Amino acid sequence: MSQGKIVQIIGAVVDVEFPRDMIPRVYDALKLDENGLTLEVQQLLGDGVVRTIAMGSSDGLKRGMTVSNTGSPITVPVGKGTLGRIVDVLGTPVDEAGPIDTDKSRAIHQAAPKFDELSSTTELLETGIKVIDLLCPFAKGGKVGLFGGAGVGKTVNMMELINNIAKAHSGLSVFSGVGERTREGNDFYHEMKDSNVLDKVAMVYGQMNEPPGNRLRVALTGLTMAEYFRDEKDENGKGRDVLFFVDNIYRYTLAGTEVSALLGRMPSAVGYQPTLAEEMGRLQERITSTQTGSITSIQAVYVPADDLTDPSPATTFAHLDATVVLSRDIASLGIYPAVDPLDSTSRQLDPMVLGQEHYDVARGVQSTLQKYKELRDIIAILGMDELSDEDKLAVMRARKIQRFLSQPFHVAEVFTGSPGKYVALRDTIAGFKAILNGEYDHLPEQAFYMVGSIEEAVEKAKTLN
C-alpha cells in the first residue's frame, strides 16, 4: 500500500505526489490517513504527481497530508443487504440503521456488456398514465427520459411512475438521487416506507449540497447495484428485471462540468466539458438488458432554459428508447401531467409492437392535435366562426382529447385532494378511440378534465349538467 503527500488543493481537485515506482492507476481510490476522505485518481501528471477528485468536502485539507493508495477503484456493497437502505456515493449507509448486511462488493467502474451479451425486447411496460401508455409507450428493459425545464413536473411524474410500476412490479428497484433536493429524497424514502415496498428498493443519494465529486459518481454507484441484481443468477440461471431511476441526469453532467476546468480541460460548447459525450456514453451504455436480466431505466433530464438543443439534453436524447417531453405551455393550461403529445416519442410506436388498433388510435390523436395546433393562429385572429364545419369538429375533439390526456396522480393527492387514478392500457385505447369516433361529441369538454377512464368523464358530465 503506497503512500503519497498532498501537494496542491484547488476546490474539489487535489494533487498528490507518490514515489515514482508506486504511482496509482487512473480511477484508483486514495484515502486520507487523517480524516478518511476518499480521493479518486483522474490524471497522471508526470513526476509522480496524480490529479484526483475529492469524494467529499476538501475543507481543512492542507499540503503535506499523508494519503494511502487502496490499490482498487471505489467499491460499494451490492446484493440483498442494500435493499431498504440509503447509501452515499461510497456505499456508506446514511440512514442510521447500522452497517449494511452483505459480504459482496463491486467496483463502480465496470465495462459495458459486450454486443453479443445484449438482448432486445419488445415487451411493453404498462405505466397506468394515459398519455404515456398511448403516445410514448415504454419497453421493458428500455431507457426512458423525462425532459422538462424547471417546475413542470419531472420529479412528480417520476414519483408517479415509481408508484405505479415499482409497486405493481414484483422485481427490485434502485433509485439514484443525483444532485437533487434533499427534501425530495426524504419524501421518496417515506413514500416507499408507507407503501410497504421499501424492502424492494435500494437508494443512493448524492444531493445538491454534496461536492461535485460525489454528484459525478453517485449515478455509477446506483448503477453498479442495479447491474449486480441484473447479473446475479438464480438456480435457473436467470438474473432479475431491475428498475433503475435516476433523478437527475443533467446534474451528473453539471458535476462533470464543475470539475472539468479544474482538471485543466478546455471547455467546449456552452461551457460544458469536452468529454461530455464520452461521460454520458460511459454511463448510458452500462444501463442495458442482457440475456441474463434486464434494467429498465427512467431518467429525469433537466432542460436548461427550456432549450432542448442545449448540449446536455441533446447528448442524452441519442441514448433513449422513449422520450417524454414536459411542456411549460401545457402546464400553463393546467393540464397535468404536462406531457407534450406531439414532441414525445417512442421507438415502440409501431403497429408490429403495439398492434394495429393502439397504433391507429395514437396516430389519430396526434393528427387531431396537430390540426388543432395549425388552426390555433386562425382562431386567435378570426375566431371559431370562420372555420369550416369539419375544422370546428376537429378543434372540438382536439380540446376534449387535450383535457382527457390529463390525469390525477396518486403522489399529488395530498396537494390536489382528488384521488389518483391508474388507467389500464385497454381502457385508455377505448376512451380515445371513442372520442375520435365522435361518440362523446355531446359531452362538454370540462367533463374530460382530470378524470381516469372515459366512464368517469360520462359520470362527471352528469354532475356538470
From Swiss-Prot:
The entry's keywords: ATP synthesis, ATP-binding, Cell inner membrane, Cell membrane, CF(1), Hydrogen ion transport, Ion transport, Membrane, Nucleotide-binding, Translocase, Transport
Record-linked InterPro entries: AAA+_ATPase, ATP-synt_VA_C, ATP_synth_F1_bsu, ATPase_a/bsu_AS, ATPase_alpha/beta_chains, ATPase_F1/V1/A1_a/bsu_N, ATPase_F1/V1/A1_a/bsu_N_sf, ATPase_F1/V1/A1_a/bsu_nucl-bd
Membrane-topology annotation of the record: Peripheral membrane protein
EC number: 7.1.2.2
UniProt superkingdom: Bacteria
Residues that coordinate or bind ATP: G148, G149, A150, G151, V152, G153, K154, T155
Subunit details: F-type ATPases have 2 components, CF(1) - the catalytic core - and CF(0) - the membrane proton channel. CF(1) has five subunits: alpha(3), beta(3), gamma(1), delta(1), epsilon(1). CF(0) has three main subunits: a(1), b(2) and c(9-12). The alpha and beta chains form an alternating ring which encloses part of the gamma chain. CF(1) is attached to CF(0) by a central stalk formed by the gamma and epsilon chains, while a peripheral stalk is formed by the delta and b chains.
Name of the protein in its database record: ATP synthase subunit beta
Organism in which the protein naturally occurs: Neisseria gonorrhoeae (strain ATCC 700825 / FA 1090)
